[in-house]
């Protein structure tokens, strides 16, 4: 996965209350800064990919928008520091001119 220059990418592992997955999926996806949301197997119920401009925006997104959603039990944030793959973001901005 590639990152967008000038943006921070973080991966949030999210644990929710039993029975909350159905309603939290859409709420997480609709949260500003959240680019993708997946339900998962394992210790986390969701993994959310967050892309924001800076650490202040990340802190606001995680602590004020995501962690405060009813049904969220715990979040664990992992900040991406380097990308090794080719992602769709570069192709999205390609206008086809060499």
Tell me the role of every PLM-derived stretch.
Residues 1-98:
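A compositional/biophysical signature of low hydrophobicity enriched in polar/charged and small residues
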């Amino acid at each position: 996965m590639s990152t967008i220059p000038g943006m921070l990418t973080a991966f949030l592992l999210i644990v929710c209350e039993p029975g909350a997955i159905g309603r939290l999926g859409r709420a997480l996806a609709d949260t500003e800064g959240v680019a993708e949301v997946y339900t998962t197997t394992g210790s986390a119920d969701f993994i959310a990919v967050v892309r924001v401009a800076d650490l202040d925006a990340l802190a606001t997104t995680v602590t004020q928008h995501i962690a405060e959603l009813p049904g969220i039990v715990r979040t664990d944030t992992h900040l991406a520091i380097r990308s090794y793959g080719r992602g769709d973001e570069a192709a999205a901005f390609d206008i086809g001119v060499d």
